[in-house]
């Protein structure tokens, strides 16, 4: 089917669904779509993710959510029961094999986990476990549950997850391709994610509201806000076209408080601007702030400082939720206790700043205005390349380098745009590649970088970028020599 941003007809969706469900044997358990609808109708409102976000947004509260997932059902339930004591929203992180649709290898990982008595996978293989087993998860917990993964083709995973009672689904055809895959075409990943969004749209038509969350941080490595904003807005538009009504747009912390506050503010405003300009009115919008996604200090005390700083900024920025980290981040997958420690530190900070929203100031206003100019310049070109079709325009924009995600593995990503920190730690553009930023905006970025270069007594270079990538793990924000 030719790629375009048009709602998939129910007949075409059901025809494609027939083939999707045959890609692994557990697909047969969701053949009766009405069974999934009836099961979702039994989920209490208190466990609906979209409802929790809507209420938090209305009340100006920032919710907390960790990342977590292990190979076996009972162990996963035990892990989440431990975490739900300290969080508002629960995750289920999916293993790496499932993300690549390598279900045979996921099955081997399950067996090895059983034999070893500990998880040998870095997440829960939902497709392999199937609906019946996964419903035990949603029935055993009291908080709303979201699937978090990194899957370019997440169609079967979405089918099983929704029929199992999960009420939020993270990802998108760009954000779960460009940072995660190497040789998956954007045409395929965007089209496959249109299926996921249409699935959620069909649930919506049956009165079941399921939240969709594009993955904001992308590669998590010095991402300028305008880059992640553009991707989030595009994926939001694609989701809304397929009938999704609850959208959470995300952003990964960069560490400079002014830029981070401005990013959350501008993200919400720009999303509304583009959604409404494209004719979408009846939707619920929320935001998610991801605590620092780059390298962490090995020392736990320093790691707690990074975590707490992220929580404080998320709260003061007015994000609807914050995705937390753990003090074991530098070492890999955290224990349940370490994950809980990160949550408790975050919650303490969220509670302390709850009544302390960041005050209006000229610096934030200037940064908001700059981000908006950058996003509009990119989005205008994307729409121009697609002749008004955002799906086609996105593919062509990546081909032309108009959309370019720093440090991404995907071959369909140019990788020519290079970011760098300025003298205050904000992310600026060192080399724009083919990204069509206005000349005066590029001059502004050049001047920001020149100020830092003068301070450090060195010429801006790729070495400075490397220093910035490693800086937080070395207990600073800017990669000073």
Swiss-Prot record:
Substrates-to-products reaction catalysed: (2S,3S)-3-methyl-L-aspartate = L-glutamate
Enzyme Commission number(s) from the entry: 5.4.99.1
Positions bound to L-glutamate: 67, 99, 148-149, 170, 176, 180
Superkingdom classification of source: Bacteria
Gene3D superfamilies associated with the record: 3.90.970.10, Methylmalonyl-CoA mutase (3.20.20.240)
Binding site for adenosylcob(III)alamin: 69, 122, 179, 296, 325, 329, 333
CDD domains in alphabetical order: Glm_e (cd00245)
GO biological process, alphabetically ordered: anaerobic glutamate catabolic process; glutamate catabolic process via L-citramalate
Stored HAMAP family: Me_Asp_mutase_E
NCBIfam families found in the cross-reference section: MthylAspMut_E (TIGR01503)
Oligomer and partners: Heterotetramer composed of 2 epsilon subunits (GlmE) and 2 sigma subunits (GlmS). GlmE exists as a homodimer and GlmS as a monomer.
Family: Belongs to the methylaspartate mutase GlmE subunit family.
Protein name as annotated: Glutamate mutase epsilon subunit
UniProt organism field: Yersinia enterocolitica serotype O:8 / biotype 1B (strain NCTC 13174 / 8081)
